[in-house]
Amino acid sequence: MATINIGIPEADRIKIAESLKKLLADTYTLYLQTHNFHWNVTGPQFRDLHLMFEEQYNELALAVDDIAERIRSLDVFAPGTYKEFAKLSSVQEVDGIPTSKEMVDILTKGHETIVQSCRDVLKCSQPADDESTIALASDRMRVHEKTAWMLRAMNK
């Protein structure tokens, strides 16, 4: 196996990758939840929410790939099973089918949780001067902050 030399010490790479694994698990869990709500939303806002949830889960699917590939670029294996994601994720899963208003509130909390995960990634990557991970986490944080704001506005 080739030695990786990207200017980040191994201990830092592993620490950063561990924080990215949590971000990956949170993102995948929110992706699944958003897709579920897209399929099962009902009510007077059905069309708007159905389309908005579709936009969101498509964006999350791309993010999952970017995060996993960043983990791999640090020479660490990315988690890829529901069992691993369940252990790592802080995004709260729900039982049953919530109302459309509850769906919006649940997804808002999920996006806010991921903002916090992005901040944790930044705390690990900034001292190591890992600009690639910093950029990824900052970009993801911006998307999730904006999405949470838009979701909150739906239920006002």
Curated annotation (Swiss-Prot):
Its EC number is 1.16.-.-. Keywords: Oxidoreductase. It catalyses: 2 Fe(2+) + H2O2 + 2 H(+) = 2 Fe(3+) + 2 H2O. PROSITE patterns: DPS_1, DPS_2. Disruption phenotype: Very sensitive to H(2)O(2) but not methyl viologen in iron-replete conditions. In low iron conditions cells without mrgA survive 2.0 mM H(2)O(2) better. Cells grow at a much slower rate when transferred from 10 uM Fe medium to no iron medium. Cells have higher internal iron content than wild-type when grown in 10 uM Fe. Significant changes in transcript levels of 255 genes; about half are up and half are down-regulated. When combined with growth in iron-deficient medium 914 genes show differential expression. InterPro entries: DPS_DNA-bd, DPS_DNA-bd_CS, Ferritin-like, Ferritin-like_SF, Ferritin_DPS_dom. One of its GO terms (molecular function) is oxidoreductase activity, acting on metal ions. Gene3D superfamilies: 1.20.1260.10. Pfam families: Ferritin. Belongs to the Dps family. Plays a role in transport of intracellular iron from its storage (probably in bacterioferritin) to its subsequent use in cofactor synthesis. This is Protein MrgA. The lineage of its organism: Bacteria, Bacillati, Cyanobacteriota, Cyanophyceae, Synechococcales.
